[in-house]
């Protein structure tokens, strides 16, 4: 998906 997927996983 995207590099921030691990951080965006909050949503």
UniProtKB/Swiss-Prot annotation:
The keyword GTP-binding applies. Disulfide bonds: none annotated. The keyword Transcription regulation does not apply. It is found in: Cytoplasm. GO terms for molecular function: GTP binding; translation elongation factor activity. GO terms for cellular component: cytoplasm. It comes from the Bacteria. Keywords: Cytoplasm, Elongation factor, GTP-binding, Nucleotide-binding, Protein biosynthesis. Catalyzes the GTP-dependent ribosomal translocation step during translation elongation. During this step, the ribosome changes from the pre-translocational (PRE) to the post-translocational (POST) state as the newly formed A-site-bound peptidyl-tRNA and P-site-bound deacylated tRNA move to the P and E sites, respectively. Catalyzes the coordinated movement of the two tRNA molecules, the mRNA and conformational changes in the ribosome. Belongs to the GTP-binding elongation factor family. EF-G/EF-2 subfamily. This is Elongation factor G. It comes from Clostridium pasteurianum.
């Amino acid at each position: 998906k995207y590099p921030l997927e691990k951080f965006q996983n909050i949503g």
